[in-house]
Every structure is written in C-alpha cells, then in structure tokens.
Amino acid sequence: MKFALLHILALAACACAFGKPYYVSSSGGSDSNDGSEAAPFKTIAAAPSENAEIFLKRGDVFYGAISGFKNCKIGAYGEGAKPVICGLKIVKNPAAWERLANDVWRIDLTKPENFDGYFAEGKRNNIGAVYDMAKDKVYGHLVTRYNALNAYGDFWVSGEVSRVNVQDKSENFRYLYFRSKENPSSGGAKIAFSTSGVGISNLENCEVDSVAVKGFGVHGVARAWGCKFRNMDVDLIGGSVQLGYPHWVRLGNGFEFWVSDKRPCSNNLVEGCTVSRTYDCGATIQGIGDGDMLIENVKFVGNTFIRCRQAFEHFVRSRKGTAKYSDCEFSSNRSFEAGENEFSTPEARDAALLSYEGKPVSGLLVKDNFFWGSSVYSNQTHTAKMESNTFYVFGDQYLVFNRYKPEAAIFADSENAVEKMRAFLGNDTDKIFIADRGDFSLLDRIISERFKGSEADIRRICKIPEKSLLESLRFW
C-alpha cells in the first residue's frame, strides 16, 4: 500500500513538472487523433511544445529535426529499439543516379520522387556524409572540388561543377557527386545522405530520455538550457561545410553547449548516452565572445564515445572580457578509438581530448574517464584539471601535441615519454599505458571488461570480429 501511494505521488509530481502526456507514433498514428496512447499523433509537431510529456513509440523513426521545446519531457513508450530522430535522406530510386566520366555518379537532390526519409531542401542539402544503411558503412570523405574526386567513395556537393571550396552562403547544393565503379545504389546497397541540421536544439528546462538521434550534418544536440539528456544514442553526426566561415571547414559535434557572453548554455547534464561516428567531438563546451563569459554546471557523466574525432573538446575565450567555467565536468566516461571517426579525414588534432584554451582553466574537471586507442591531448596552451583518468595509447600516437609548437610534442614511444606526460599534466593519478595494436587478447579483454553494455555497438561500428576469430588471427 505504501509503495502504491509513493508511486502515485511520483506520477503526480512528474505530471506537475511537465504537464499532460502525449503519445506519438510515426508508424501507426494520425495528427487528427487526440494524442493518447490508444490514439497517438503521427508527428512530433502535433504535440504541444511547452509543459508536456511527449512519448515517442519505440521502433519508430521520426524524420526531421526537433526544436523549440520548453518545460517538456521527451521519452519513449512501447517495446523495441529507441525511437530515432533522423536526418537521413534516403535514395529510393537507383535510376536517379546519372553516370558521368571517370566513374563519377551524380544525383539531383531537388527531386522528391527519388527519395524517402527526410526530404531536405536548399541548404539542408549541404550533405555531411554518404551512408550505406544496408552495410552500416560511412563514406565521409568530402572533397573541395569536382576534379578532386580521386578515390572511390569520395563525394562532393554543389549546384555548379566549376565551384571550388564550397562555403559561400549562396550555394544551392543541387547535385551530389559520388565516385564509384558501379551505381552506388546497386548490389544491395541502401544509400542515404546525412543532411545539414541539428537533431535536437533550442530546449529549455527539458528532459530527453531513451531517444536516438542519427544522420544530421551539423550537430546531434545543441543549444540547450537547464536540460537533462539521458540514455540517448547519437550516431553519424557532422561533416557539413560551415557556410560563411573565412575558409573551407567542416563541423559536427555530438553534444555541443555553446558559451556566449549573453546566454551561455548552462545547467545541462548528459548522462548514460552513447555517441558514435561524429565528424568532430562527441561532447563539447565551447564559445567565443566579446564580453564576460561564464558557463556553469555542465556535466558529461557516464557516457560512451565510439570513434568520435575527440571524446571531449573545450574552449571558452573572450576577446575583451573574462571567460570562466564553474562546476563543469567530464567524468566517468569511456571512449573507444577517438580519432578514427570514419570520415576519412585524419588530422593532427585527432585525440581523446582537445583544448583551444589560451588562458589557465579552472572550474572544469576531467576525472575518472577511460580512453582506449587514441592520442591523449591535442592542446593549445592550457588543459583542464585532470584526475584519475586511464589512457591506453598506441605506440604510433602522441601523448600531447600543440600544433603551434609541434617540436614540443610528446610521443607514446617509451616509458620516459609517459613520465614526461605526467609532469606536463601535473598530477600522478592519471594512468597511461602504451599498447600494441596487434594485441588482440588485450583488445578483447578491454571491450568485455571496460565497455560492458556497448560490446555489440563497438564490434559493429569498428568491424571487430568476435573473440574466437581474434585469437585465430593472432595465432596465424
């Protein structure tokens, strides 16, 4: 009786906090329904954007980004896989591909009859990656001009074949060009494109739980204030060109909390999420402004990062004022092979951690994390406070690297280098081990012991065979 009463009180408190519940099913709903579990809406847009609980049906896919919710809880109901907020534009008509010279194929992105999924238009066709859904394979190497389509799997997007370094805001992104021996949609392939956009953005005082985000070319989650993000899967993020930037550059983070001098994205928690295959970092606190800047209470706790360019990136810089963190942390997370992000664009900054801090950092703690198979820190001048982290680094990777002072790099080539790194970090609680890329037994043990619950995701994404095959490869 006591338990039942407590349960009723808990439900009442939840209803008071977020308001009336609404249910949404893309596979079995209708926007003319009342939004009850028995008669769900079809689209998220049909539900209120303020003071509501919004439950998305498990196993369903919701195409297009969501934005602008306030005082809401967004969760899942039913059985099966997490509901997916998806930005993928899916080729349904293989004949839409036109073969050009030198094994280059072209598809017109403006023809809705040739696509399923999210039909992006205009600058949303600033494609971040080409993705074979059937093989779970990413083709992420975007070239800067048509005549740079040199390797199979390269792609380029523009309305004019003569364009170079597509970054101008006037670009219309009409055609996607892809180099392939055969029609890209042949042989059982199911080709899709990650479209330019942010999966979830502009949330205030919201909770998002047990929802997946996939296939957006800008960020997975960004621009949030006072929010909690739990048990989410964020995959295949980034790669779009940053339009209007002074030079050609791509972008794309899993979770980004931007710091401005007017409205910093403070008071956010990301917990128990899995972030994979991001063009840039899995998680970041970053920002540049003119006035005084303060970011408070942003925490990444207990998350898993798989093949992101970096697991965590941080920088807060003010041109004319102060820039500070307060009570921010990246703790108890685990990262697998940061830097191997599958976008085929290796850079010197590929590492577990990335800092662009120009001044000493306080109020930001990196603690109790586990990193496998990546360089440690790409650092400009100052690191965050480090405590009790564990790094397994391959012998051909670095421990710290500053692109402005490459001569000061410390490479993972000896135990003496490890001691130098300890001195650089200024603490003796971090553990650093130099690992052999060919040590498959260690790899298997790390996956099974340190990445419990994520073993299948790691083996699928990284194409790692099961233990028995690993052992046979080592034997031969």
Residue positions per predicted region:
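Short glycine/acidic-rich loop motifs that flank beta-strands on beta-rich extracellular proteins
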Residues: 63-66, 195-201, 216-223, 234, ...
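Low-complexity, Gly/Pro
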Residues: 58-59, 77, 88-90, 216, ...
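Bacterial N-terminal signal peptides
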Residues: 6-14
